[in-house]
Amino acid sequence: KGLTFEEACILPEAFFTIWFNLFIKNKIKKKQKILIHGGSSGIGTTAIQITKNFGLEVFTTTRSKNKSIKCKKLGADHSINVKNVDFEKLVKNKTKNEGVDVILDIVGGDYVQKNINLLKRNGILINLGWLTGSIVKINLLMVMLKRLTITGSTLRTGSLKEKEKIAKELKK
């Protein structure tokens, strides 16, 4: 209610993308900590609501104070304006240097190594976009020592059968 036709049309893609990546492909668990980059984006706002309702502690990044406020209203526990603060340092501080279990990244570029730094042992980095670059240099030794999983996906390449499976899972 209150959405334009165009706005309503994009909802399934955001929900399907989040559900598939968090719960079907990566089996995210309650009480984990998640960092969602681009918290005020379509993917970000959807991810905040789903993960908060699922019982995760939610960190987000944005590029303005107003967007951070919006993310908090949607359920984010912590919203970081990256124009004013180094998200890596703040998340480390808020988690007492433990880091987070899962990161949803639509930014890419120089965020990727920072994400690797922030992930706990056996953490999962899910790449859903590359606003600042798709080609990156990372420390593979850190990936190996922390036993990290780096993954990503797009619905566009999925078959109709895969999308039907996601829809059925979401309906439950």
Regions found by a protein language model. Name each.
Residues G38-G39, V107, W130:
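NAD(P)H cofactor-binding loop motif with strongest signal on the N-terminal glycine-rich segment
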Residues D86-N97:
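Short amphipathic alpha-helix with an adjacent loop that forms part of the alpha/beta core around
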Residues A8-V85:
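Mid-domain Rossmann-like dinucleotide-binding core that forms the NAD(H)/NADP(H) cofactor-binding site
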Residues I18, T51, C71, D101-I103, ...:
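Terminal peptide-recognition signature
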Residues F54, D110-K172:
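Glycine-rich phosphate-binding loop and adjacent beta-alpha segment
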Residues K31, A76, G99-V100, V143:
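Local beta-strand N-terminus motif with an aromatic residue
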Residues L35, I80, D101-L104, I126:
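N-terminal Rossmann-like NAD(P) cofactor-binding module of classical short-chain dehydrogenase/reductase
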